[in-house]
Amino acid sequence: MKLVIITSCVAGVAHSDMCAAALKKEATDRGHSVRVEMQGGSNLSDMLPKEICQSADVILIAYAIAVARKERFEGKPVVKVPIDQAIRHIKQVIDKAEEVYGQTAGSERKG
């Protein structure tokens, strides 16, 4: 699965970084391809381009604040989870992304 992980936190440092690293590790340990974007405060400089977001199978958003430029995810399956819950339940969050991927991949095969 190609996974884009977006973390957003008010300060954009501690929680975003910790959450992004843990989610990325869990997903790559399971064999998934992962791209990560961290947003927070005024940090919008490392945003992934729309092309990368559109090539993902699932967009995973761990948030404490609203995510900027959500139009990049249009038409993609999105899993949203509060960042504090994501940090405490890393495996379950990746499980959910895999579940959503399985549902969308299954519907594409049927259609």
Regions found by a protein language model. Name each.
Residues 56, 75-76:
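Short, well-ordered alpha-helix to beta-strand connector turns
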Residues 70-73:
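Glycine/threonine-rich flexible loop motifs
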Residues 1-23:
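A short, flexible N-terminal coil/short beta segment enriched in small residues
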